[in-house]
């Protein structure tokens, strides 16, 4: 554990210590000197007051179960800054609370990363108005069941990638008050939040965002998600954005501006609850990778991809693999002249009866027919007019 703080009082608690072997917690008064405290069985409170002329405090110890940082009467901790991606508490910590008034947080990237034992976290005293980077902040905090960030000021934050990735114990998360107007990276922001049943991101300002890859990947418990107001005009990567959101039955992405997107691979892979998708208005002129895009979308019966500009696409392998309920597919206007990989494109599409290919040139039509044969899909009518 590393907790760095120009402070005068630090209180911390060590609990759940068993056995007779003394355990050591070190308190560093500066970078070179330290005080060792031996902790035996039982739950104990400790307080260490730094001299006024000491500007740095670091606590370290693998046995720490609970951390409380608060201000004393005369002095209060004001800045919390971990050493370069260092956590301020170890993975064994169960509870952490930061109650100092007006705690000014400056650098919190990765600050609770991999704290898998953490069940309770009180950040009510944090002033986040100067924070620019929240990357990996709570990543793999798998035991957290609740988190109140409703009063946070995120107006200066530019990076939220991986922020809640792996928080599988959370069933709900209120981020509706987040100001995301400066955020450029939301990659894996809610990835692997497998316990989330609801998530309101409808008020997110995404006008600056360039990366949304795996943003909601493996949010397997989400039954609804409103992203219809997302401004995606600057997004370049949407790979795996909704991958394995298997309980989503409806998703409106028809208004997405995809004019700058190059990667859509795995975007809806495993979204087995979706029954239809209308992506006919998407600008795919810069897209090169769409492999596995709909693989495992076993609930899809209709898919409209007409009008797509696929002239720059190179990889289409497994795109519709295991879309077992798909009966019709509209690929009107497609151009596969630059495609180098179509492996298993239609494998498992056992219900497919027609593909609309109006406006497609003969080489593209021939490629599609050949791939249907390779994937052992028979009885499909190609409609060209």
Regions found by a protein language model. Give the residues of each.
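Negatively charged
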Residues: 2-385
């Amino acid at each position: 554990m590393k907790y760095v703080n120009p402070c005068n009082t630090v209180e911390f608690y060590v609990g759940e210590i068993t056995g007779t072997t003394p355990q050591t917690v070190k308190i560093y008064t500066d970078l070179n000197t330290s005080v060792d405290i031996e902790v035996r069985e039982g739950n104990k409170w400790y307080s260490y007051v730094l001299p006024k002329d000491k500007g740095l405090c670091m606590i370290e110890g693998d046995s720490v179960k609970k951390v409380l940082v608060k201000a004393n009467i005369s002095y209060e901790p004001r800045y919390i800054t971990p050493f370069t991606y260092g956590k301020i508490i170890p993975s064994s910590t169960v509870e952490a609370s930061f109650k100092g008034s007006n705690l000014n947080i400056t650098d919190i990237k990765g600050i609770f990363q991999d704290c898998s034992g953490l069940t309770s976290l009180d950040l009510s005293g944090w002033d986040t108005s100067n924070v620019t980077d929240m990357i990996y902040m709570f990543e793999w905090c798998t035991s957290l069941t609740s988190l109140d960030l409703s009063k946070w000021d995120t107006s200066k934050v530019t990076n939220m990638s991986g922020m809640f990735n792996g928080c599988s114990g959370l069933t709900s998360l209120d981020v509706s008050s987040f100001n995301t107007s400066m955020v450029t990276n939301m990659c894996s922001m809610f990835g692997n939040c497998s316990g989330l049943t609801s998530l309101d991101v409808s008020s997110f300002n995404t006008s600056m965002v360039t990366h949304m890859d795996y943003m909601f990947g493996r949010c397997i418990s989400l039954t609804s998600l409103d992203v219809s107001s997302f401004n995606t005009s600057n997004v370049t990567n949407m790979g795996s954005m909704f991958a394995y959101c298997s309980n989503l039955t409806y998703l409106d992405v028809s208004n997405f501006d995809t004019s700058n997107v190059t990667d859509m691979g795995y975007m809806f892979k495993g979204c087995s609850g979706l029954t239809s998708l209308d992506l006919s208005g998407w600008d795919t002129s810069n897209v090169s990778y769409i492999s596995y895009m709909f693989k495992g979308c076993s609930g899809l019966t209709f898919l409209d991809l007409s009008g797509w500009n696929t002239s720059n696409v190179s990889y289409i392998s497994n795109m519709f693999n295991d879309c077992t309920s798909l009966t019709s597919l509209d690929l009107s206007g497609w151009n596969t002249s630059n495609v180098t990989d179509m492996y298993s494109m239609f494998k498992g599409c056992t219900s497919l009866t027609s593909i609309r290919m109006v406006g497609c040139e003969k080489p593209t039509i021939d490629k599609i027919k050949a791939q249907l044969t390779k994937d052992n899909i028979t009885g499909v009518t190609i409609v060209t007019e």
